[in-house]
Swiss-Prot record:
GO molecular function annotations of the record: large ribosomal subunit rRNA binding; structural constituent of ribosome
Record bears the keyword Ribonucleoprotein: yes
UniProt keywords, alphabetically: Ribonucleoprotein, Ribosomal protein, RNA-binding, rRNA-binding
Coiled coil: none
Cellular component aspect of the GO annotation: cytosolic large ribosomal subunit
Role, per record: Forms part of the ribosomal stalk, playing a central role in the interaction of the ribosome with GTP-bound translation factors.
Pfam families: Ribosomal_L10
Native organism: Helicobacter pylori (strain ATCC 700392 / 26695) (Campylobacter pylori)
Quaternary structure note: Part of the ribosomal stalk of the 50S ribosomal subunit. The N-terminus interacts with L11 and the large rRNA to form the base of the stalk. The C-terminus forms an elongated spine to which L12 dimers bind in a sequential fashion forming a multimeric L10(L12)X complex.
Family membership: Belongs to the universal ribosomal protein uL10 family.
UniProt keyword Ribosomal protein, yes or no: yes
Name used for this protein in its record: Large ribosomal subunit protein uL10
Superkingdom of the source species: Bacteria
Length: 164
């Protein structure tokens, strides 16, 4: 009876993972050997604030969920923590920032963007891109620059006329 209950639990877990992986734009797999529970919980809290999921999943269950969701095939070995979400840049930044703080205990092993395998170097390059909010700020600055220069020019013209 207990084996049947365990099997049912695994089937439900795989179904839940499939639905979450299907919506994810990015999925990163990291080695977390030697990382304390407290530090892993800190990562989860940072991720939760950004809408990113963090979960330690058995490789066989993750493999089944990924395969049934259409992700490219990965050879999963050893202990892994899976991170996924809808924003590739935010997820990449989170992983590489956390990796810098915990070099010996947290390493990116594999990445999948839009269900296709990408190299660790690719994920690192994406982590260096500006976030959506930063890009919007840059764009807004570019759009307002002509008006700002026009107003500054008018103000300088007014000051020049007042001096004469």
């Amino acid at each position: 009876m207990q084996k049947q209950h365990q099997r049912q639990h695994k089937v439900e877990l795989v179904a839940n993972l499939k639905s979450q992986f299907a919506d994810a734009k990015a999925l990163l797999i990291c080695d977390y050997k030697g990382l304390s529970v407290r530090k892993l919980e800190a990562l989860r809290n940072k991720a939760r604030n950004q809408g990113i999921k963090v979960q330690v999943i058995k490789n066989t269950l993750a493999h089944i969920a990924m395969k049934e969701t259409g992700y490219s095939d990965l050879d999963l070995k050893e202990t892994n923590v899976f991170l996924w979400g809808g924003d590739q840049i935010a997820l990449s930044k989170l992983v590489f920032d956390f990796q810098k703080e915990h070099k010996d205990h947290f390493v990116l092993k594999a990445g999948l963007f839009d269900k296709e395998s990408v190299s660790v170097a690719h994920v690192e390059a994406v982590s260096k891109l500006p976030s959506k909010e930063e890009l919007m700020g840059m764009l807004l600055s570019v759009w307002t620059a002509p008006a700002r220069y026009f107003v500054t020019g008018l103000d300088n013209l007014r000051k020049a006329k007042e001096e004469n």
